């Protein structure tokens, strides 16, 4: 069964209390999680100043420094496929796109909604394209599709050749559109990248030049924000509960990615105001047999089989919490897209039990209230009964508190989790990469200006997930949930290896493994991926662990 949160005796220590001794000189960890950028979307043309080896579009010959197609551009070609009977994670290929369709606007700020984006050519070469050849670096772009079953299809067994086709045939889900004829307004959004060699993302480049960059870090769950933030908090996933036991969600909230009759890959039930649960232990459930078959064919054992509890309906996309940010219960029901309160153990409870201080600082909080800058699915601890039903909810604080705590390091917790306000998160359509850089520059600058704090701190800079952007990196499938696409991670610290690119395979649960190693904690639950071993290097491929499944603990980013 899913492990319920156990009674914890010393759960409520003050957020600024002295932490027990650490195993490294790092006494403060600040984890900053923006949104929705793949590694190649950001670092496509980055060349390490140190001369380190790096896997990106430039090093692979996919593009040139000027962003134009490189000698091996054709190996990224996007293909056309067919799924007319039941969902497949490796659909039957019909052919190859000649040219890619014009990207759509989706809901980008300041642009007409859900139309072709006239700033881009009507047709694009079949492969990655430089966004800033067509628009300014600070301009918003449309939002690529990034959902669970869609990403499994897009990855296509590691070939990564169905990103555009899935975006065009299923999009964000059938409940978000009336019928296939209404279109998805995605086009080739997923294939866009920024060009560091031409001056894009200057602050990310500065951080990578001076600190430690991972080029093998991944989102832990296929798909979008909500499930990936839950993996950061729990090392696993959350499921539907009723009256203290696993239950069955309303029928209209269960995902069904099987195609509707007479359509090609138009999901039967899918969408943000619709299907988001999957009973992933049961191969008779829609979409699950294909994932189980893929796991069974892996050349190594997956973690805990599917790592799905029998009878559990897991939340694999975005729903809001069964609690309001104040701690009050929220209304639930078939047309209220919230998951009931959760008993899944979190890193916050484990830290409190150990007597280690922590806080979560979500952008858009305003005391106990919230503003339009608040992202409810980016705030995973408000889903937890153990947090929201007691004094630990007081550790969820706004960003005025964050900057006050940085200035007065006596109040700075040992472990801090930070999510930017929506407009500074980097999320396509609602923010920009440049706005996320501004937030990071301000935050890291504040930490560095407090010398006593900076000398014993590490700041991990990452994003929740890839946002549906294409990426050339290898993906290690661990269980039915993922991993998913490669994403950026930079360790900013006096102890970081300077200008080094680390190839150790990691995902967001590696952040938990680092915390557990540094503050002497045990794995969170029977199914949490923090049980996985540290990778053993394969001499023939630095990016693929020889002892799969395995994920690192981020210690290789530092020198102590």
Describe the predicted segments one by one.
Residues 1-10:
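Bacterial N-terminal signal peptides
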Residues 16-560:
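N-terminal pro-sequences and low-complexity stem/linker regions of secreted or lumenal proteins
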């Amino acid at each position: 069964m899913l492990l319920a949160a156990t009674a914890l005796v010393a759960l409520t220590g003050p957020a600024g209390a002295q932490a027990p001794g650490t195993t490294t000189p790092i006494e403060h960890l600040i984890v900053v999680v923006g949104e929705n950028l793949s590694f190649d979307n950001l670092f496509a043309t980055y060349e390490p100043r140190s001369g380190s080896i790096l896997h990106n579009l430039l090093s692979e010959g996919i593009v040139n420094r000027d962003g134009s197609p490189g000698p091996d551009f054709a190996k990224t070609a996007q293909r056309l496929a067919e799924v007319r009977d039941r969902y497949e994670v490796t659909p039957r290929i019909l052919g190859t796109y000649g040219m890619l369709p014009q990207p759509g606007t989706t809901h980008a700020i300041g642009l007409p909604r859900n139309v072709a984006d006239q700033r881009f050519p009507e047709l694009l070469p079949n492969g990655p394209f430089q966004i800033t050849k067509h628009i300014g670096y600070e301009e918003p772009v449309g939002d690529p599709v990034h959902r669970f079953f869609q990403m499994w299809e897009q990855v296509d067994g590691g070939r990564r050749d169905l990103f555009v086709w899935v975006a065009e045939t299923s999009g964000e889900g059938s409940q978000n559109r009336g019928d296939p004829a209404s279109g998805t307004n995605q086009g080739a959004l997923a294939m866009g990248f920024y060009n560091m060699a031409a001056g894009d993302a200057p602050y990310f480049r500065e951080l990578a030049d001076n600190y430690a960059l991972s080029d093998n870090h991944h989102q832990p769950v296929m798909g979008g924000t909500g499930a990936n933030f839950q993996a950061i908090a729990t090392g696993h996933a959350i499921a539907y509960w009723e009256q203290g036991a696993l239950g069955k969600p309303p029928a209209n909230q269960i995902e069904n990615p099987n195609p509707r009759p007479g359509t090609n890959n138009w999901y039967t039930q899918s969408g943000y105001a619709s299907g988001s649960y999957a009973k992933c232990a049961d191969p008779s459930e829609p979409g699950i047999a294909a994932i189980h078959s893929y796991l069974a064919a892996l050349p190594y054992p997956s973690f805990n089989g599917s790592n799905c509890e029998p009878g559990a309906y897991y939340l694999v996309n975005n729903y809001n919490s069964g609690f309001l940010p104040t701690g009050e219960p929220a209304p639930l029901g078939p047309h209220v897209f919230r998951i009931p309160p959760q008993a899944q153990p979190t890193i916050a409870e484990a830290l409190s039990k150990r007597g280690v201080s922590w806080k979560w600082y979500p952008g858009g909080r305003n005391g106990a209230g919230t503003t339009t800058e608040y992202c409810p699915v980016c705030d995973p601890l408000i889903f937890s009964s153990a947090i929201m039903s007691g004094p630990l909810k007081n550790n969820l604080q706004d960003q005025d508190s964050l900057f006050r705590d940085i200035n007065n390091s006596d109040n700075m917790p040992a472990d801090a989790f930070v999510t930017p306000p929506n407009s500074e998160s980097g999320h396509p359509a609602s923010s920009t990469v440049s706005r996320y850089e501004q937030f990071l520059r301000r935050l890291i600058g504040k930490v560095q200006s407090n010398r006593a704090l900076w000398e014993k701190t590490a700041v991990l800079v990452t994003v929740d997930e890839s946002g549906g952007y294409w990426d050339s990196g290898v993906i290690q499938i661990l269980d039915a949930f993922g991993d998913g696409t490669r994403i950026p991670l930079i360790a900013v610290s006096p102890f970081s290896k300077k200008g080094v690119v680390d190839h150790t395979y990691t995902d967001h649960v590696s952040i938990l493994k680092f915390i557990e190693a540094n503050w002497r904690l045990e794995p969170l639950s029977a199914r949490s991926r923090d049980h996985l071993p540290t990778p053993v290097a394969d001499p023939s491929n630095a990016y693929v662990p020889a002892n799969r499944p395995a994920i690192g603990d981020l210690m290789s980013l530092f020198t102590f």
